[in-house]
């Protein structure tokens, strides 16, 4: 989670469309409160979107058009690029949060993992 404030557009537009996270509401708020343990939810150590992205390593981000966190993923991608970090964003049509890994036979799963493997091969070597 890159932004615990719930300020991303898709927290609203994809509510009830994301069949994994469903909606950012009371349950997520309670989990966020537990996770933050009283700290400011805008603290970059908790919500990296509010931090400095300079010096980050090359990054690959994966989301779906129905992902509750899609807008946050897009915002992180833009912030990484603005900081001069090589960043790749893959977005899969009709996919909910992390749905690409739930069905090993889905074409999106194969494509996601092929792209991720290729990204790691390029940056970490074979």
Please annotate each region the language model reported:
Residues 1-126:
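Alpha/beta-hydrolase superfamily serine-hydrolase fold, recognizing
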């Amino acid at each position: 989670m890159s932004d615990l404030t719930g300020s991303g557009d898709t927290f609203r537009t994809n509510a009830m469309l994301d069949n994994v996270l469903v909606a950012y509401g009371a349950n997520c708020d309670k989990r966020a409160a537990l996770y933050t343990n009283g700290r400011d939810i805008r603290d970059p150590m908790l919500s990296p979107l509010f931090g400095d992205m300079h010096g980050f390593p090359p990054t690959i981000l994966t989301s779906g058009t129905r992902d509750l966190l899609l807008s946050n993923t897009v915002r992180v991608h833009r912030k990484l690029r603005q900081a001069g970090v090589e960043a790749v964003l893959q977005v899969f049509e009709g996919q909910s949060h992390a749905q690409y890994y739930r069905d090993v036979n889905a074409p999106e799963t194969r494509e996601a993992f092929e792209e991720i493997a290729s990204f790691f091969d390029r940056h970490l070597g074979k």
